[in-house]
Amino acid sequence: MGQKVNPKGLRIGIIRDWEGKWYADKRNYAALLHEDIKIRKFIKEKLFAAGISRIQIERAANRVKVSIHTAKPGIVIGRGGAEVENLRKQLENLTGKQVSVNIVEIKVPELDAQLVAENVAAQLEKRIAFRRAMKQVVSRSMKMGAKGIKVACGGRLAGAEIARTEWYSEGKVPLHTLRADIDYGFAEANTTYGKIGVKVWIYRGEVLPEAKTPAKTAARGGKEAPGEGGE
């Protein structure tokens, strides 16, 4: 199961949170879901060069809060915040609601699977050999602290007549372990021979449940924590 399913979806509610945070009844659910898709598509197309990894959307009444996770916040914000203000107005026109935009910087782009996948796709479009592109990103990610990485390219690789999939990996990528923090990204490269799909899995370590401290245990159970009671 872990080998086939999207690792992000499998871990939602366990170690990952939802990217859309809102509630709607049956009548409005489809319309709001389509609105989310439109917002994400618009931002990705408008800020293609900014290295957008993910877009979180929160809703409350007639207000929409959009959080953009980007490797290049300067491009999104612009001089004196002009670009982000322009983006906010365009999103308000698109949705007809009050929109606030929050920019979140990605400190280490080499550990973000979506950005790594888009990087490989961009190299393939520049006619760089797919094996070289894969080995480069794998090497960079491991140097920046990844515990493991797997990159797969599928399609008419190097212009071959028959499509195939090739992959390159380093370290370990435990897809079945639900506490494993595995990031997944997918991108497409439009080459002269057709589309080439790029998939990236990055293992960033385990997310362990919060350790129960004696003080917390005492507060919940109404008992004194060890070492705190009087003689």
UniProtKB/Swiss-Prot annotation:
Family according to the record: Belongs to the universal ribosomal protein uS3 family.
CDD domains cross-referenced by the UniProt entry: KH-II_30S_S3
Keyword Ribonucleoprotein among record annotations: yes
UniProt keyword Calcium present: no
Pfam families: KH_2 (PF07650), Ribosomal_S3_C (PF00189)
UniProt lineage: Bacteria, Bacillati, Bacillota, Clostridia, Eubacteriales
BP-aspect Gene Ontology terms: translation
Residues in KH type-2 domain copies: 39-107
Assembly and binders: Part of the 30S ribosomal subunit. Forms a tight complex with proteins S10 and S14.
PANTHER family: 30S/40S RIBOSOMAL PROTEIN S3, SMALL RIBOSOMAL SUBUNIT PROTEIN US3C
Protein name: Small ribosomal subunit protein uS3
PROSITE patterns, A to Z: KH_TYPE_2 (PS50823), RIBOSOMAL_S3 (PS00548)
Molecular function, one GO term: mRNA binding
GO CC entries: cytosolic small ribosomal subunit
Keywords linked to the UniProt accession: Ribonucleoprotein, Ribosomal protein, RNA-binding, rRNA-binding
Role description: Binds the lower part of the 30S subunit head. Binds mRNA in the 70S ribosome, positioning it for translation.
